[in-house]
Amino acid sequence: MIIHAGFVDLDTPTGPMRTHVYAPAPPTGTARYPGLLLYPEIYQQTGPIVRLSQQLAGHGYVVMAPEIYHEHEPPGTVLAYDKAGTDKGNAYKAATTLATFDHDAAVVIRALGAHPACNGRIGAVGVCLGGHLAFRAALQSQVLAAACFYATDLQGGILAGGTCVDTLARARDIHGELLLVWGRQDPHVPDGARAGIYQALVAAGTTFTWHEFNAQHAFMRDEGPRYDPEAARIALGLALSLFQRTL
């Protein structure tokens, strides 16, 4: 499927938020497509995130991928996959308030709903920090499904300065369906943390699918030594199955 790529600057209380838009090219008819709010890792719109966005758009989705650190960096800033970029991304993660993350999600959800190619049915997807933010986006009633890949800090951590402790506690408020995908060799979400997340979702009565690969953190990032192309292919297929079923 041919896609178009561009961006919009969405207004937020903390300034304009550059949001990258990928959508199927306009057909000759009046086709409309589901929308996806896509969250990146802590590095913003890197090459792997752009390619993931393009893949999803090519499967028939209007994808909006916001620059989550818009209040800290100018539009278009991409952090490097190195120690300096990692340190900066983690610092911004801690400095951004939970209210900002949640409000920004609502802004993108409204923009998706207003996009002329979107049919109004909206899901969320994210990797790493973005997996956590996709989970939180599902707390908003418009989000019908969320695919969360190796979501960090769900079990408690430094997101928003350590104020993320209510994410799992609010799982009962999620009325859509979740997909949670993990790597068993992920040091950021070890066995005990994954077990705690699973038990919390069961206790909350959440509708979810759970899949673990023998893979590292960031195994879907299609550059670098941790990339596992076969696991990434299967994981993306799980997400597409979720969205086809729910959106």
Q: Where is each model-derived feature located?
A:
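N-terminal cap/leader regions of alpha/beta-hydrolase-fold enzymes
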Residues: 1-247
